[in-house]
Amino acid sequence: MAKAFLSLACALSLGACVMPPSASEKASDAARELNLSARFGNMDVAAKKASTNARADFVQRHALWGSRIRVVDVELAGMNMPDSDHAVFQVDYSWMRTDESTMRTTRVTQRWTSLGGAWAMESEERAAGDIGLFGEQVEVLRPVQRNAQFATKVIRED
């Protein structure tokens, strides 16, 4: 009886290992790999996940990451698959400029396509949040530097 139960348990557990990943799982893995690689500065790995048509634009838009822009966190916030070969991801970035301490957030929409089983990002655009993540020209207002000392008065009696 124990042998039969053990054999049945092994057969059922081995059957679960044979299931290939679904299209949504493959798309999620590709999007996660691109965004985490970009966050940690591995732009060569991240750029390989962009389609050949979008690669040059991707590299240009992320050129300031690691030098003037520090990406603090990235999160896949949502996913929509209109069909098995296309996916749309909502990605939330927390970031800051390296010369200031203000935390900013931006939501980005990424469009992905399956090319023969391999997923590639076709486009990305800012959907909401702070401007400047992709190197857009932003006028940064800085406070006027004031003299931190009090005015000095000299009192003399001659």
Regions found by a protein language model. Give the residues of each.
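Bacterial N-terminal signal peptides that target proteins for export
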Residues: 1-6
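Short solvent-exposed beta->alpha transition segments
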Residues: 22-23, 28-29, 36-90, 101
